[in-house]
Structures are given as C-alpha cells and as structure tokens.
C-alpha cells in the first residue's frame, strides 16, 4: 500500500501548494459554479455540498461561496463551463488523467497538449488510460488519528477499504456513491479528516527512477498550474528522494 500513501501525499502536498498560490480558490469557485447549475441547495445537491466542504476547509469566505452558487444557479453566460477529461502518458510510460472545466475547448486542449509535449509525454485518445483508474471516495486522516476508531466507524458506514499508510496516516476508501454518507458518519464519530474528495485512484502503481520521477512531477505541476485544470491523477510511483527535493 506504499503507492497509495505516496499518491495521497502528492495530492495533499499539491493542495497545500495551490492554496499558497491562490489557485485553488479560482478552481473551487469554478467547481461550485458548475455544481450549482444542478441546484442551489447543498442538502439536495451532494456534489455542491462536497465542494462547499472543500472550500470551507481552505478557509474560503462564505460570501464568496454564496456568490459562486448564485452565479451557477442563475445560469448566466459566465457559468457556462464544459467538463472534460484528457488522457495521456508521461515519462516512463505512466498514465496521466486530467479533469478540466473550460469555456474554451480549443485553448484548453492546446495548453494541455503543450504541457505533455514539454515534459516528455504525449496526449492520448479518450479511453487510453481511464481504465487504469476507478472513481473512488478517498478520506485521509493525519498520522495521529485513532486508527481503530476510524476503521470501526468507516466499515460500519459502508466503506470499501481502510488503509494504514507507511507514514502513519489512515486512508478510507469508499464508492463514489457512498462517499458523503461515510464522511458524515466519520465526522459524527468525532473523526475529522485532513482531506476528503472523490478521486480517480489507480489500480496499480508504475515505479519510476529518479530522472523520470522528476520529469513526471514537473509535468503534473505544469498541468495543475493551468487555470482550466481541476485535477490531475497519475499512477506514478515517485521515488521518495524526488518528493523530498520538490517539497513533498
């Protein structure tokens, strides 16, 4: 399960770095706007509720959240974003899966293709790597959590798996459909996660040497820096020394 630990760490590290740059706010506002098109009430719109929770976790003001909801629910031109995915291969043959929200498909595909090309990868066709991932709820707890308490509450609530990571953190995995119910049950048990999201989890990891590990990290960071990109997932098993040298 070491690969899962590294994968979770990469996602968490990037979330922290994005917050410092302010980019995560822009991405979350866009996600709230899109989610609100299916209903402005979080209690009736699980997707909206999930992204509001993420926004509150990074200390977004409620006024900012409310404005994004109103913009999406109002259906104006400034809320017309297409949700797309791009798939490709990075250095060492690793699979890369990119989720975007865009108001200009031509601009976005050009930027994504450029990022792959610049860092030794190539953009593939639809379906080329998606089969290597599964849509999974991932609820991550810090290393000081009571592992037994998490396991008991999670399994009772219908979680698929509870993983004790090498770094001491505990990862709860759920089906996408059960994600909010399991998260709510854990919160009700007094267990507050470090992060919680529905993600694309790789079935197996692809080990990399240091050189390719550095290239893949640069590719992922360039993709995540693009305004239209919401999430980047990879099955890359990055060497520890690369993670440490890049602030992991």
Curated annotation (Swiss-Prot):
One of its GO terms (molecular function) is DNA binding. One of its GO terms (cellular component) is cytosol. Gene3D superfamilies: 1.10.10.200, 3.30.70.980. InterPro entries: Integrase-like_N (IPR017856), TACO1_YebC-like_2nd/3rd_dom (IPR048300), TACO1_YebC_N (IPR049083), Transcrip_reg_TACO1-like (IPR002876), Transcrip_reg_TACO1-like_dom3 (IPR026564), YebC-like (IPR029072). It is found in: Cytoplasm. GO terms for biological process: regulation of DNA-templated transcription. Its main location: cytoplasm. Keywords: Cytoplasm, DNA-binding, Transcription, Transcription regulation. The keyword Cytoplasm applies. It holds the Pfam family TACO1_YebC_N. PANTHER family: TRANSCRIPTIONAL REGULATORY PROTEIN YEBC-RELATED, TRANSLATIONAL ACTIVATOR OF CYTOCHROME C OXIDASE 1. Belongs to the TACO1 family. This is Probable transcriptional regulatory protein HCH_04926. The lineage of its organism: Bacteria, Pseudomonadati, Pseudomonadota, Gammaproteobacteria, Oceanospirillales.
